[in-house]
Amino acid sequence: MSTAGKVIKCKAAVLWEEKKPFSIEEVEVAPPKAHEVRIKMVATGICRSDDHVVSGTLVTPLPVIAGHEAAGIVESIGEGVTTVRPGDKVIPLFTPQCGKCRVCKHPEGNFCLKNDLSMPRGTMQDGTSRFTCRGKPIHHFLGTSTFSQYTVVDEISVAKIDAASPLEKVCLIGCGFSTGYGSAVKVAKVTQGSTCAVFGLGGVGLSVIMGCKAAGAARIIGVDINKDKFAKAKEVGATECVNPQDYKKPIQEVLTEMSNGGVDFSFEVIGRLDTMVTALSCCQEAYGVSVIVGVPPDSQNLSMNPMLLLSGRTWKGAIFGGFKSKDSVPKLVADFMAKKFALDPLITHVLPFEKINEGFDLLRSGESIRTILTF
């Protein structure tokens, strides 16, 4: 029996208030309106940004159905939808691509003006919600809301992918992998034979390493205070790893000496102000490039010496690895299918969706790289 055009009752993880566990609830998911798509979720990853919603460091309207790194199958479409059809495998896009705004029209820009990250409304593009629970409307998150058996997204926030792709793996292309990989290949534009330093060896940091390796870097130095992360970093391409706690002098001095005067490219994948300045400082003063990859949106201002830039360094950042989402996600999935990179090293745990709170405990304890929830 077709569910198209009907309200679907299903399970979702609702966050009713900050700093509380997710509550598995029965929710009602309205059918898609014009230019909207309803998706049956198959797999979703647990990303640090979702935990920032729980902790309150990423402020978004509550109650909310969070989740933004996922893959699923189109259940039904609203009128006027042309880029996907029912049965298509898809990845929701937390950074939309409307194709019409000045950012989408700019060759380098990818932070579409229709995003819900700059000033979160927690709604669809038309300002309303498709979720109801206990008679109350529930907010959307970044236009995706993947912690639900069904979700509704705008057409500008979904990409059709290869019908043969394993959704429980390629869901990582919806955020973590692409954010790291793109920071190396697209934002920094890492060059053949270069030396790179990557601060923070979580899932996104490992993806940065994969990007540096794919771009042909000769040396990739992983930096983390948890030496348990070094083996995995080397498995995906790090040539050496250093622990700042093993040295009496500041780690930027250690890295500058190791690289004969500074690395070509550095990446801060932690979201700490002190390590951002450290990463900038350790890159070569005349032509080094440092990229800020991870940062909680409530971060404080930092102080730095502008002479670090005056000598010739470049300091930059990007959302979603600088990729234009709707254009790039299908290509990244095709590259994965062509074995140009692996996603298995990033996945440490797979849990049923109902165990979402366990998955977040694994993230907070540092035990997991990526936990995938399956529906």
Curated annotation (Swiss-Prot):
Binding positions (Zn(2+) 1): C47, S49, H68, C175
Database matches in InterPro entries: ADH-like_C (IPR013149), ADH-like_N (IPR013154), ADH_Zn_CS (IPR002328), GroES-like_sf (IPR011032), NAD(P)-bd_dom_sf (IPR036291), PKS_ER (IPR020843)
Cellular location(s): Cytoplasm
GO biological process: one example: retinol metabolic process
Cofactor note: Binds 2 Zn(2+) ions per subunit.
A GO MF label: all-trans-retinol dehydrogenase (NAD+) activity
Record EC number: 1.1.1.1
SMART domains xref list: PKS_ER
Subunit structure: Dimer of identical or non-identical chains of two types (E and S) coded by 2 separate genes at different loci.
Family note: Belongs to the zinc-containing alcohol dehydrogenase family. Class-I subfamily.
Name of this chain's protein: Alcohol dehydrogenase E chain
Organism: Equus caballus
